[in-house]
Amino acid sequence: MRFTRRALPLIVATAAVLTAPAIAPASAAPPTSAVEPLERAHAHNDYEHDRPLADALDHGFTSVEADVWLVDGELRVAHDLQDTQPGVTLQSLYLDPLADRFAANGGSTYRGWDGSLQLLIDIKSDGPSTYAAIDEALRAYPQLMTRWTDGTMKERAVTAVISGNRPLAEMAAQRTRFAGYDGRLTDLHSGLPAELMPLVSDNWTRHFTWTGVGPMPEAERAKLHSIVATAHAHGYRVRFWATPDMPGPERDAVWTELIAAGVDHINTDDLAGLQAFLLAHDPQEQEAA
């Protein structure tokens, strides 16, 4: 199943608002100039930008990624445990700024946009206990967050997906959930319903040798198209991490193949670079313009 602009979830990372000197606070107000929401744009480790969440949204990203550790009862956002700081949390960087933006934009992440921002939450600490804390946090934003009840989705402005140390059994057992499960390519034929596993993500280098130098081998191109077709047939979206991300012809070549295959989310740390590439080369964005 191919997701349309209407149904595409966004992954979001926000700005720190408390004590972290290296992280600028996110602005609740929408940007002054119109920004085109980019269906495929995913901000990898979004919290590492100067203005978490805000920078991604200023470049039209519809999916952002936050690494989360449960420390002293807080859902702290950082790549490594030693970098966690009190008050720099999922709520302060993402949920609160997104709720403010939701209110400022009349119920949408981007004014006039009817899609859902995907917030990819990568659990770094113990899966079950951290997920329980995430679940509690998401439930505090019922008007903002997508939920699933008895297998039926009620889409809202932000859709959370759990990656990293994912407690599948605990998530599957919930009658009402406020997050989806991020699967792996080994889950493509698992039979897990798309309402539980809306996304399948994996490491590019574990499945492909091509990194953009020369033409893509035909066997690998066929493999990529088959993966995406299989995922879409089950209603799953597709994302790869560890794709080339240094500006240059190799990155452009890989991004071109990802678009041609219908990969749903393109992973990057270069917000401006991916924005410019998608606006110039993604047929979806050209149709929307």
Question: Where do the protein language model's features map onto the residues?
Answer:
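A structural motif detector for short, solvent-exposed N-terminal "entry" segments of globular domains
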Residues: 49-54
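Short N-terminal segments immediately surrounding and downstream of signal-peptide cleavage
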Residues: 29-48
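Catalytic cores of phosphodiester-bond hydrolases, prominently lipid phosphodiesterases
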Residues: 32-38, 55-62, 69-289
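Secretory targeting and sorting signals
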Residues: 1-29
